[in-house]
């Protein structure tokens, strides 16, 4: 059988990782799917972070 084209990825807030002065403890993470053929590089999306309480850039992690 062939591998599926779509894979599940995890998106993590970039500002929660680096900024210790935030509203609450923790790191915001979202799960999503991406097409392996169309998007070969790491995905970056603007999503709402509940810990920073605003929209921030979320990058794909392993």
Swiss-Prot record:
Biological process annotations from GO: translation
Query: What SUPFAM superfamilies does UniProt report for this protein, alphabetically?
Result: Zn-binding ribosomal proteins
Return the GO cellular component terms, semicolon-separated.
Answer: cytoplasm; ribonucleoprotein complex; ribosome
Q: List the disulfide bonds.
A: none
Q: Where are the transmembrane segments?
A: none
Q: Which UniProt keywords apply?
A: Ribonucleoprotein, Ribosomal protein
HAMAP family, per database record: Ribosomal_bL33
Concerning NCBIfam families, the annotation shows: PRK00504.1, PRK00595.1, rpmG_bact
Family, according to the entry, reads as follows:
Belongs to the bacterial ribosomal protein bL33 family.
- Protein's name in the database: Large ribosomal subunit protein bL33
Which lineage?
Bacteria, Bacillati, Cyanobacteriota, Cyanophyceae, Oscillatoriophycideae
